[in-house]
């Protein structure tokens, strides 16, 4: 009986300690504390900025063991917004995002490595029906208690993708072959 009680107590402590270290966060999109933005050069003369307004996701964060961190994000590609209705309609077409056939893009991390003050988050990005590995450079912006009794953590991440890697072959000129991703998220720790 004592052995069983001791085993149960040790197992409880082990699982409690593990879950306290690696916390799961839900991206706070309702509070407008998360953004999935992008930019691409327009003819080499200026930047064109856009955002995806509808997305959801979670991340697991363990500051002491980044290799245990995980990121999962789903983006509704129909929500693309560049502040120009005709351009947005074109981006939703089969020439670009093909939202009728591929209504979602997803990112699922496969590894997280600490590089100085940053985290290199490598994962599989599925966009336009194609899945390719992508690495995002992320920085912890801050973490701690919020005024409502919860805990939060915020990150900013950047990365680049080549359009042709995702079967987007419309010729936009040599200056417009890559899209830069700028992602800012604040997560609310789940209980």
From Swiss-Prot:
Localization per Swiss-Prot or TrEMBL: Periplasm
Matching PANTHER family: PROTEIN YCEI (PTHR34406:SF1)
Top-level taxon in the UniProt lineage: Bacteria
Signal sequence interval, chain numbering: 1-22
NCBIfam families, sorted: PRK03757.1
SMART domains assigned: YceI (SM00867)
UniProt protein name: Protein YceI
UniProt entry keywords in alphabetical sequence: Periplasm, Signal
Source organism of the structure: Salmonella typhimurium (strain LT2 / SGSC1412 / ATCC 700720)
Predominant place of localization: periplasm
Family matches, as Gene3D superfamilies: Lipid/polyisoprenoid-binding, YceI-like (2.40.128.110)
Cellular component terms per the entry's GO annotation: extracellular space; periplasmic space
HAMAP family for this protein: UPF0312
Similarity section: Belongs to the UPF0312 family. Type 1 subfamily.
């Amino acid at each position: 009986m004592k052995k069983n009680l001791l085993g149960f107590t040790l197992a409880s402590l082990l699982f409690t300690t593990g879950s306290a270290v690696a916390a799961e966060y839900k991206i706070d999109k309702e509070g407008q504390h998360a953004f999935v933005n992008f930019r691409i050069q327009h003819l080499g003369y200026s930047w064109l900025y856009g955002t995806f307004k509808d997305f959801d996701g979670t991340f697991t964060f363990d500051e002491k063991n980044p290799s245990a961190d995980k990121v999962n994000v789903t983006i509704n590609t129909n929500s693309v917004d560049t502040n120009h209705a005709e351009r947005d309609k074109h981006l939703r077409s089969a020439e670009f995002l093909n939202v009728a056939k591929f209504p979602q893009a997803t990112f699922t991390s496969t590894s997280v490595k600490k590089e100085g003050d940053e985290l290199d988050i490598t994962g599989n990005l599925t966009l336009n029906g194609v899945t390719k590995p992508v690495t995002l450079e992320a920085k912890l912006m801050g973490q701690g208690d919020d005024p409502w009794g919860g805990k939060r953590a915020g990150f900013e991440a950047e990365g680049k993708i080549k359009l042709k890697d995702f079967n987007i072959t419309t010729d936009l000129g040599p200056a417009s072959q890559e899209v830069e991703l700028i992602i800012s998220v604040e997560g609310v720790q789940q209980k």
